[in-house]
């Protein structure tokens, strides 16, 4: 039997050695195994320490190539006296950990079935135990304390998946059971070789020992391989990540590795807004030596483009450029530019061409314009209108402007000569309309020119790059002069006489008439009016009387003269006042004064009455008009659309409150205990009992004392928004207090508070249909709000309140998110990117609310950071179904999370879908047609860190079901193996009767089974 066992073992060893190399070759693509110890194929004596001596035997067996390999064997079952137990130890040499934080061990062994050994009683085992012990230095040769069990840490009890029977039941000692004989090779077919892998850590000391304890088995330890997992060095996203040891905690724990950007690359920008100079990229190494969870990355610098995928950045070739950092390829140089050197961030312009400071690097280079063409002018008295045509060459730009240079010369000059030393800049009296520089049209009115004086007018063409050119602007010039000159200004105006409704004025002739004066033009205006409301009259003499003036008013007067050459300039302004009405009446007969006084008194009375009537009518009309104008902003005539009024459009927000909310007398309010604190002040429970009505419980929010006026307007404005809506699933406004302090807003009292905290406190207590009914109520409220074109902007489970009848009501209407990252977990992609809130973005937020409801108030995206949430949304990852969530509901969530907002369902469609689920509950389990919607990747929640959980009680606390810790202890569920055996039928006996808790517990039991299956410590 010993010969047969050895032959069978050798045959299995040969096959497993080959398989090991294949497995290592495949897995090395993803992870590196750094070998710390390996006895596979060892032929010389290994010499591990055994205790007691002879408990384990080191022997050689033949493989199928007739080569010896060393094994350790223990088989003392049959030879042991009855009633005595076996305790045989085998210890490895000191193993250097070499930086490993966690060690993995792979065992190849074979175990004989106790039934084949003919041993009765409980002394036979088919298992052995694995231990490890850390040490800073190897043990001294005479050390015996290493066998004390307290110094060792148990890794696991190793059980064989397959044990094999003995071909001869007469031998069960170690030497007989595993002896190598000349005929062994032909007797190895029945030998069963097991492979088990375990890990232990974290390792903190220089090295460690591994020990194997046999307590009565007949086994052969064929090969022992100790190794650690290492994530290989990798190039990814233009960053190099070093070889990184896996975490010592194992499992789902991660070790962050900081990457280094490859040459000519830089970290990507941080945050939503894109801050330059971002954080270095990070990649995480998991416990199995595999890279995962990339955070950030690098991008090629300006002048460099991606090469070899995302492994390197290479310089842009000559003639190409890249202006900004990123992973886009280089681009050909724009027109009239060229990059003579590689790695160009911008293409320099060719000679004679330029880029303005406002031009982007991708803009073509441009040049200054050529000179204007075909200058000509039209004389208009002492002024002239100068015209020209556009330049033949605009330089490739559209920002063409013109400047006019005026020179006054002595004698006849040629435009091209510039006048030499006989020309000078024009006098200040010469003016240009509309202006002298920066003209956009090809004409200008030049005034203030003297007659018979030669001028040179030069028109320059300029654009955005003219200042960059070393040459002066291209210009065209023309000689001009006027043959006639208008009169100079009238120097002064005198008052001759005045009355209550008229003034008579006179003036002298201009100092320089420059010809015969044909007439004068008098301009006058009331000082209380704008000068643009002036009147004119013409007089052929130097005297004029202005009539139909108002008594006691001050008027301004100006006069100008006209000759055949045209009007001269106006003189300076002078002011005269008409007589008051009282002074005029004193010169009239007494009777006439009485008549006029009576008439004026009657007129005054009638005027006062008319003003009073008009004021009342206007005020009423203003109220109605203001209200109507607000409505018209949101109406579509003829379509029967409901209206919503934005209180911020009122000039006086208090007017909006008076029209849209009901004022409550504070005497009817009884304030009780504080139930919370809002953004404006304390929220209290109270009672409201208006006269003639029954008492009702209300929530009262009072504004903080001393709040700024803007805060008061915001506080009342939100109440004005809420007061416009009447729906059973929208929080009802009971009234406001604005005529006394403090300002107060009264709403119906919602006993159970926000929906998210309500669900967290009652996890697992509702059926799926009850949760659907809650969501249906919120959807109905949002359908009602969308019919008013109202966008909520901050919809979440926290903004929904629950009353004692489990009715959900939408609240926080008119609350705008504060800051770019506020409510990011509920925000649609277009809101994050552009701040664009629509009813479609409310649909997205409602889908997140659905997920919150089905997960009993779980935080969306769990503990992911804001940046990780943003990256996940941009990469089109979506939340997975919560535990126990019916497939039909999760499909509805995915519909609300369509990236294209036009493809998201409307709220009326969501209400119809919920109604169908309530009428036909089997539709909750419908998976839908996979082709009807795009496939979306689902996020996975962060897994439990099982190595950190030392008991089922800690596990229950980690999954939020610590209320059942006493139940587990009472029924003796003290190990994870016991918990892993639980099924749905066992839960009621444990006192777990809530359907939601049962679903959650079974979900985590499945995860526990997967973990234990990987560890190989339980049969599930």
From Swiss-Prot:
Q: Which SMART domains match?
A: EPH_lbd (SM00615), Ephrin_rec_like (SM01411), FN3 (SM00060), SAM (SM00454)
Question: So which domain of life are we looking at?
Answer: Eukaryota
- The principal localisation class reads membrane
**Can you summarize the PTM annotation of this record?**
Ligand-binding increases phosphorylation on tyrosine residues. Phosphorylation on tyrosine residues is mediated by transphosphorylation by the catalytically active EPHB1 in a ligand-independent manner. Tyrosine phosphorylation of the receptor may act as a switch on the functional transition from cell adhesion/attraction to de-adhesion/repulsion.
SAM domain sequence ranges: 947-1011
The record ties this protein, via SUPFAM superfamilies, to: Fibronectin type III, Galactose-binding domain-like, Growth factor receptor domain, Protein kinase-like (PK-like), SAM/Pointed domain
Name it.
Ephrin type-B receptor 6
The uppermost taxa in this organism's lineage are: Eukaryota, Metazoa, Chordata, Craniata, Vertebrata
Q: Which gene encodes it?
A: EPHB6
């Amino acid at each position: 039997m010993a010969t047969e066992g050895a032959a069978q073992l050798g045959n299995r060893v040969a096959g497993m050695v080959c398989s090991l190399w294949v497995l290592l070759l495949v897995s090395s693509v993803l992870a590196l195994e750094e070998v710390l110890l390996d006895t596979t194929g060892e032929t010389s004596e290994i010499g591990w320490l055994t205790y007691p001596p002879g408990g384990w035997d080191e022997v050689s067996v033949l493989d199928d190539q007739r080569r010896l390999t060393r094994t350790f064997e223990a088989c003392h079952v049959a030879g042991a006296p009855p009633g005595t137990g076996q305790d045989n130890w085998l210890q490895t040499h000191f193993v250097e950990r070499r930086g490993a934080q966690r060690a993995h061990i792979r065992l190849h062994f074979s175990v004989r079935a106790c039934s084949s050994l003919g041993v009765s009683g409980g002394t036979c085992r088919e298992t052995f135990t694995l231990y490890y012990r850390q040490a800073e230095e190897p043990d001294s040769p005479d050390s015996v304390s290493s066998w004390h069990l307290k110094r060792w840490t148990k890794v696991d009890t190793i059980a064989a998946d397959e044990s094999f029977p003995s071909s001869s039941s007469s031998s069960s000692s170690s030497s007989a059971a595993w002896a190598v004989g000349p005929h062994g090779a032909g007797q190895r077919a029945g030998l069963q070789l097991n492979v088990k892998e375990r890990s232990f850590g974290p390792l903190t000391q220089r090295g460690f020992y591994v020990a194997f304890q046999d307590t009565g088995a007949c086994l052969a330890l064929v090969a022992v391989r100790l190794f650690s997992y290492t994530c290989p060095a990798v190039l990814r996203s233009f960053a190099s990540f070093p070889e990184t040891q896996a975490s010592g905690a194992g499992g789902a724990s991660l070790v962050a590795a900081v990457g280094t950007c490859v040459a000519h690359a830089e970290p990507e920008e941080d945050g939503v807004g894109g801050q330059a100079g971002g954080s270095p990229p990070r990649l995480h190494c998991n416990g199995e030596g595999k890279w995962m969870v990339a955070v950030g990355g690098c991008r090629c610098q300006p002048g460099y483009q991606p090469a070899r995928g995302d492994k390197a950045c290479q310089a842009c070739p000559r003639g190409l450029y890249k202006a900004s950092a990123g992973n886009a390829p280089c681009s050909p140089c724009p027109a009239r530019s060229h990059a003579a050197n590689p790695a160009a961030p911008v293409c320099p312009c060719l000679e004679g061409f330029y880029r303005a400071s406002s031009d982007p690097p991708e803009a073509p280079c441009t040049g200054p314009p050529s000179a204007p063409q075909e200058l000509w002018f039209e004389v208009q008295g002492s002024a002239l209108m100068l015209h020209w045509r556009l330049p033949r060459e605009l330089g490739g730009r559209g920002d063409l402007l013109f400047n006019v240079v005026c020179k006054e010369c002595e004698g006849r000059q040629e435009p091209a000569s510039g006048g030499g030393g006989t020309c000078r800049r024009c006098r200040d009296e010469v003016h240009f309309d509309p202006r002298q520089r920066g003209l956009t049209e090809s004409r200008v009115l030049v005034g203030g020119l003297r007659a018979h004086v030669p001028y040179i007018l030069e028109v320059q063409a300029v654009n955005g790059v003219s200042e960059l050119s070393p040459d002066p602007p291209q210009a065209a010039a023309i000689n001009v002069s006027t043959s006639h000159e208008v009169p100079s200004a009238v120097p002064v105006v005198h008052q001759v006489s005045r009355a209550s409704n008229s003034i008579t004025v006179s003036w002298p002739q201009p100092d320089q008439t420059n010809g015969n004066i044909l007439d004068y033009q008098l301009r006058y205006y009331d000082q209380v009016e704008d000068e643009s409301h002036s009147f004119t009259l013409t007089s052929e003499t130097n005297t004029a009387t202005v009539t139909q003036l108002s008594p006691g008013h001050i008027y301004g007067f100006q006069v100008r003269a006209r000759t055949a050459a045209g009007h001269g300039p106006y003189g300076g302004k002078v002011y005269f006042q008409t007589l008051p009405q009282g002074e005029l009446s004193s010169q009239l007969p007494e009777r006439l004064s009485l008549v006029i006084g009576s008439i004026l008194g009657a007129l005054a009375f009638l005027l006062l009455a008319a003003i009073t009537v008009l004021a009342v009518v206007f005020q009423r009309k203003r109220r109605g008009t203001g209200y109507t104008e607000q409505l018209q902003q949101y109406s579509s005539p003829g379509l029967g659309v409901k209206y919503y009024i934005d209180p911020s459009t009122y000039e006086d927000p208090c007017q909006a409150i008076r029209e849209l909310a009901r004022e409550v007398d504070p005497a009817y309010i009884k304030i009780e205990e504080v139930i919370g604190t809002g953004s404006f002040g304390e929220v209290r429970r109270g009672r409201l009992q208006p006269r003639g009505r029954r008492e009702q419980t209300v929530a009262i929010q009072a504004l903080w004392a001393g709040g700024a006026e803007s805060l008061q307007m915001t506080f009342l404005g939100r109440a004005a928004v809420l007061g416009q809506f009447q729906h059973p699933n929208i929080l009802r406004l009971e009234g406001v207090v604005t005529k006394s302090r403090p300002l107060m807003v009264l709403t119906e009292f919602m006993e159970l508070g926000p929906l998210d905290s309500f669900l967290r406190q009652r996890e697992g207590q509702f059926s799926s249909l009850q949760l659907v009914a809650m969501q249906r109520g919120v959807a109905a409220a949002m359908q009602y709000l969308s019919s008013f074109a109202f966008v909520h902007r901050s919809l979440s489970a926290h903004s929904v309140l629950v009353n004692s009848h489990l009715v959900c009501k939408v609240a926080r209407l008119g609350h705008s998110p504060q800051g770019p990252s506020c409510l990011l977990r509920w925000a649609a992609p277009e809101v994050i990117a552009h701040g664009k809130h629509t009813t479609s973005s409310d649909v997205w937020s409602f889908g997140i609310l659905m997920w919150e409801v089905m997960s009993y108030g779980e935080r969306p995206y769990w503990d992911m950071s804001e940046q990780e949430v943003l990256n996940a949304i941009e990469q089109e990852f979506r939340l997975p179904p919560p535990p126990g969530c019916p497939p039909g509901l999760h499909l509805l969530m995915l519909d609300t999370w369509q990236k294209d907002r036009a493809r998201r369902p409307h709220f009326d469609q969501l209400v119809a879908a919920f109604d169908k689920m309530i009428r036909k509950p089997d539709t909750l389990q419908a998976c839908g047609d996979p082709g009807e919607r795009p496939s979306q990747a689902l996020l996975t929640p962060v897994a439990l860190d099982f190595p950190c959980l030392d008991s089922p009680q800690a596990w229950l606390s980690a999954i939020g079901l610590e209320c059942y810790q006493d139940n587990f202890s009472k029924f003796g569920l003290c190990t994870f193996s016991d918990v892993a055996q639980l099924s749905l039928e066992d839960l009621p006996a444990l006192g777990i009767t809530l359907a939601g808790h049962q679903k959650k517990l079974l979900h985590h039991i499945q995860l526990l089974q997967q973990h234990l299956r990987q560890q190989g410590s339980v049969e599930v």
